[in-house]
Amino acid sequence: MIRSIQKKWYKYQQAKKAKSFDSHWYMRFGWLEQPFTSLEQLDSLFEIHSPRKFTFADSFYAYENDRHFIFFEEVDDEHPVGFLSVLEVFKDGTYTSPEAILKLGYHLSYPCVFKIDNTWYMVPETFSNKTVELWKCTEFPLKWEKHSNLLENIEAVDSTPFYHEGLWYLFTSTRRDCKKFGDRLDLFFTEDILNPNWQEHPMNPVCKGKIQYRMAGKPFFYRNKLVRPSQDSLKRYGGHIELKEIIKLSPKEYEERLYETIYPEWNKEDDGCHTIDVHSNFVVVDAIRLTKKDN
């Protein structure tokens, strides 16, 4: 009840803010001097801003043949059907021009890339097609082909595979018995993600609340704790990221607790963040920047 009241207040505040400010999503990336253990390490990252009519968000990192790549969602403000792109980044903060890797007749976002043996795979968000899809890279990083549907006849967003103790788990947010994505978190598991026989976790939904459980990237270790990044959209869509410590994860149990909160305090003009990808000392995070409207 309290969050519902707070949400109405923040919605009013965001409507007022929209009258004076434009906003756009952009990406921040960089190499840290040591593995990610402190939020202050996010303050000095490089920035990648999109052309005026485009949006860059939902960023994921890939390292291949001593090269560094960021996969992400692009949206054209005039034709807001998301598609997926990639660019290469360098340690001096420079980067290549984006190249599209996947455009379909339905919205694509959240290109969660991961590697099995020597092959790259991707689970993009395809909820508007009522699927959770697995794509295989045939020529890195630009060419991809559909491998299979992991789940069908389901509205699910920000689906994130994670290999743990001999099993593949799929974290995802659905709208089953709730109004908005993020109100619940669901888990599925299988032994082989390439030839899956998904089982639904008996505790589903493993988390349930008010727009606070949607995935915000892949689980990673932070201060020697396994954490799951999740979005809290109380203030606005993509308001901030919460790091939830995963205490129990098995085919029978799931338990997490709030461990740390990431607010976009690196720049006073930023108003939110909703995806983070961490690999040892490399971090990429998206954020939303406000700019004063021209009078």
Go through each PLM region and give its residues.
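Carbohydrate-active catalytic/glycan-binding domains of CAZyme proteins
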Residues: 1-295
